[in-house]
Curated annotation (Swiss-Prot):
The lineage of its organism: Eukaryota, Fungi, Dikarya, Ascomycota, Pezizomycotina. Dipeptidase; part of the gene cluster that mediates the biosynthesis of 11'-deoxyverticillin A, one of the dimeric epipolythiodioxopiperazines (ETPs) from the verticillin family that act as mycotoxins. 11'-deoxyverticillin A is required for normal conidiation. The nonribosomal peptide synthetase verP is speculated to be responsible for condensation of amino acids to form the carbon skeleton of verticillin, whereas the cluster-specific tailoring enzymes are involved in further modifications leading to the production of 11'-deoxyverticillin A. This is Dipeptidase verJ. It comes from Clonostachys rogersoniana. Keywords: Dipeptidase, Hydrolase, Metal-binding, Metalloprotease, Protease, Zinc. Induction: Expression is regulated by the cluster-specific regulator verZ.
Length: 388
């Protein structure tokens, strides 16, 4: 069990468990599917996901942690050529193939453990799965390199259940600059990036700004018609780190209506002492700065070797909630943070999508590689007796 019998008597922990029974705790980012790919490359069919002690995540500990929903990340690494700002599509086909494999792993887990997990694509489906006693399973993609420069691929990812895409991972791409790269290339969003954000708004795909440069974050927050998320990020005012966002970005996020989901990654949490308490500091900073209706949790479990101490695996979420209650954070604010905020954003993103489609917003087209030459076109005209 996650706590001793004596600890269960603690008022804050008891209250935390009650709150987690009322509202689904939705983790904005979990990399267990990629851990499966790395640790069990030839054993996926026989893997027992109820107990995987080598990982941060398994079904038993998700239950112990009272997790109500997870955005499973269909992450794959950036192509090597992206490090040189070479975004040629040929380098991304392997990323696309691996992305489809990762989405297959996620769907396979949901199907195999249908008594524990349920696919969720909308807020209503999250509630339906949660109230059935299962964990709502949502899908995120961690980088636009995974769409192989194709809006059509992105639309198909949405059809497969993907509900957010992080604009970048560790490298710049065709669309945007990353904070982890050697330096800016576009100065924020590129022209293609502006178009892809608009298309994400149109189809109802949440924009995720974790990993992006501050310039990219500000650019998106200035143009997005829908609220955005930071699926796993931290605050620069609490800890200086390249991945952490400054207060002026948080202020723009408040105006946008989005959610900043605090991560458990050690260095962004605190270079010297990354602890549960320090994670709580980041949560409180967002809450105090822009309101608890704009903060969430995005652990990055199984995306890093170690997380903040005290938050060592998915069973430990109640301890963070108890710490925040101890600090005086209200029940209402806790409920917003653990799940209601991201569910609100999901609803808002859908509403924006519906309005854009109703007003005839044009889809983002792409130019296909030519497959017919003029000789072939002439043959079609001749055969069908149709001439210009």
């Amino acid at each position: 069990p996650i706590v001793s019998k004596m600890a269960l008597l603690d008022d804050n922990l008891s209250k935390a468990l009650k709150l987690l029974a009322d509202v689904p705790l939705i983790d904005g980012h979990n990399d267990f599917p990629y851990f499966i790919r790395g640790w069990f490359p030839e054993q996926i069919d026989s893997l027992d996901c109820r107990n995987v002690r080598i990982a941060h995540t398994d079904l038993e500990r998700l239950n112990q942690g009272r997790v109500g929903g997870v955005f499973w990340s269909a992450y794959v690494p950036c192509p090597d050529r992206h490090a040189k700002n070479d975004f040629v599509v040929d380098a991304q086909y392997e990323s696309l193939r691996a992305t489809m494999q990762q989405i297959d792993i996620i769907h396979t887990l949901i199907e195999r453990y249908s008594d524990r997990l349920g696919l969720a694509r909308t807020s209503s489906e999250v509630w339906e799965v949660f109230r059935s006693g299962r964990i709502a399973s949502l899908i995120g993609v961690e980088g636009l390199h995974q769409i192989a420069n194709s809006p059509g691929v992105m639309r198909n990812l949405y059809r497969l259940g993907v509900r957010y895409i992080t604009l970048t991972h560790d490298s710049n791409n065709l669309y945007a600059d990353s904070t982890n790269s050697s330096g800016p290339f576009h100065g924020g969003l590129s022209r293609d990036g502006i178009s892809i954000v608009k298309e994400m708004n149109r189809i109802g795909m949440m924009v995720d700004l974790s990993h992006t440069s501050v310039a990219t974050q500000k650019h998106v927050l200035a143009i997005s018609k829908a609220p955005v998320i930071f699926s796993h990020s931290s605050c620069a005012s609490v800890t200086e780190h390249p991945r952490n966002s400054p207060d002026d970005v948080l202020d723009m996020l408040k105006a946008n209506g989005g959610v900043f989901m605090i991560t458990f990654i050690r260095k962004p949490t605190d270079a010297e002492s990354p602890t549960l308490e320090k994670v709580a500091d980041h949560v409180q900073h967002v809450g105090d700065r822009i309101g608890y209706e704009h903060v969430g949790i995005g652990s990055d479990f199984d995306g890093v070797m170690l997380t903040a101490s005290g938050l060592d695996d998915v069973s430990k979420f109640p301890l963070l909630i108890a710490e925040l209650l101890k600090r005086g954070v209200s029940d209402h604010s806790i409920k917003n943070m653990i799940g209601l905020n991201v569910l609100r954003v999901m609803d808002s993103v859908e509403e924006v999508s519906m309005k854009m489609k109703e007003t005839g917003e044009e889809m983002l087209h792409e130019v296909f590689e030519e497959i017919w030459d003029e000789k072939m076109r002439d043959e079609v005209r001749k055969t069908r007796d149709i001439f210009d």
